Amino acid sequence: MVVHWTIVDEIRLLRWASEFKPAGIHKHFHMFCIVERMNSPDKYPVTLLQKETMKLGKVFTAKDIWDKLSQSYNLEKIDEMENTYSLEATTESSRNGNGNGDDAEIHEETLLELNNRIRVRKQDFTLPWEEYGELILENARKSPNSNEEYPRVEDMNEKDSTIPKESPSTDLKNDNNKQEKNATIKVKELPEYHTEENDSPIDVQKEPIKEVQSDEKELQREHMSEEEQKMKSTNKTAAPVRKSQRLKRSKEVKFEDEEKEEIEEDNTKDEEQKEKKEEIQEPKITHNEEVDKEKNENEEGDDEREKSTSYENTNGSESEGVDEGVDEELGYESEREAEGKGKQIESEGGNLKKKTENKKGDDQQDDTKKDSKDKNEPLAKRTRHSSSTGNTSNETSPKRKRRKAGSRKNSPPATRVSSRLRNKK
């Protein structure tokens, strides 16, 4: 029964054939994998760009797939490309029959596969002798260890050209024997190399240190007395003290330098404490001074207020007596303050007298004018207030009295003097 191949089926076939190539030794096993994946699209899905639906229930056989592949590929040539190496590459043991029976039974295809693996194996990189031979020789001459290697390589190349090749089994044995010999030689050379040629840097540093120590010990022995040597000889019998242990000095024993240092430390501590106390006392003193100043200012302000209140509350008679006392005090102070200024005071006194006389004349004129107005006014227009005012005058009123010319109210107001100035005077 011929199977109808759709585009989707061909795409799926090429997809699995690229993964499992049906050529070479394992072509039948690969074909088995391809058939399984073609018949189970649900289990092994393939992403497609086409939207065509697949018909389920289609079954492919290996013959159908071989026929389809043979239409587009030459399967025989593909097998030859996979099996490029001919039967000449087989081992001599298998040709001559020298090997065991197992080698004779091995299939030729398996031997070809083994040969392919050996050829594909990576080899160590080496520079071509024709182009880089001179550089290799120069480097070999410079390095002392490599002088022996390169002539050996050249000798081996000459021997290889003359001597026939041996079997790989014998080569492996020879290599193993050489490695063992080299290992034994290196082990023997190691102690000689380290002891004779190269000394470690630590040993080199220790040599001058040892010489210096020996010189110091000799000097110490010369200066040592006989008694000290005897003490050392007796101490040898006692138990030896380990180097790691250090004898601790008792606390009571103190050297002179240590005592001086302790005294200096105590002095410094005492000075620091004194400075701290002084710093604490200084702000207290300044604070007390500020408080005293504020108290003095408050007392002066209270004195001035009391004087001002007493001056306003006093009666006429008492005020005049107080004023006279104040005038006397002010006069006493002004006499001291105004020495050499008598002329100015006299001129001011004359001006004050003139002003008072002018005021008196003006008052008299005003009184005469009022009296004349009252007389000329008719009785109807006169009122109780106007009549009383018209009848009364400065001269006839019993309560009002003329003030003295030298009274304090007629004189200009005296300037106040603070208590500080009084105390100073």
UniProtKB/Swiss-Prot annotation:
Residues 149-163, 172-197, 204-231, 270-309, 333-346, 354-380 have a biased composition (Basic and acidic residues). It is found in: Nucleus. The keyword Transcription applies. The keyword Ribosomal protein does not apply. Residues 209-310 form a coiled coil. Keywords: Chromatin regulator, Coiled coil, DNA damage, DNA repair, Nucleus, Phosphoprotein, Transcription, Transcription regulation. Disulfide bonds: none annotated. GO terms for biological process: DNA repair; DNA replication-dependent chromatin assembly; DNA-templated transcription; nucleosome disassembly; positive regulation of transcription elongation by RNA polymerase II; regulation of transcription by RNA polymerase II. Residues 408-418 have a biased composition (Polar residues). It comes from the Eukaryota. Component of the NuA4 histone acetyltransferase complex composed of at least ACT1, ARP4, YAF9, VID21, SWC4, EAF3, EAF5, EAF6, EAF7, EPL1, ESA1, TRA1 and YNG2. This is Chromatin modification-related protein EAF7.
